[in-house]
Regions:
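Structured alpha/beta reader/binder surfaces that contact nucleic acids or chromatin modification marks
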Residues: 1-113
């Protein structure tokens, strides 16, 4: 199963299903299928989700793609991404990973936990 570490601040929205996408830059590729999120600093805290789609596009289009352009204007989006990727630029290509919530993932007929 694919595994992805997440900073503690972002873990609760994944667990509750509020966060159903993540944006990555210059990291190992994620593919559709099962993904285990692991909370950085607390490896026992995990959430399993089903990745439904992975899309490459410029960072400048990412907020609109995940329907969060109101919450993430350019300055906020860049500042947030630069917390994790200090060298990222507005036109760099990112991978957007979209997934079901953990609760929706549990309902899949092939889920084995």
């Amino acid at each position: 199963m694919q595994t992805l570490g997440v900073v503690p601040r972002l873990f609760p929205p994944i667990e509750t299903g509020e966060k159903t996408s993540t944006i990555r830059w210059r990291e190992d590729r994620i593919a559709p299928g099962y993904l285990r999120y692991v909370c950085d600093g607390d490896a026992a805290r995990t959430a399993i989700v089903w990745v439904t789609r992975c899309t490459d596009l410029p960072l400048s289009q990412a907020a609109a793609f995940v329907r969060r352009e109101t919450e993430w204007p350019k300055e906020i989006m860049l500042a947030g991404m630069r917390e994790h990727y200090p060298e990222i630029r507005w036109n760099d290509i990112v991978q957007i990973v979209e997934h079901l919530t953990p609760a929706e993932t549990l309902l899949r007929s092939d889920f084995s936990g």
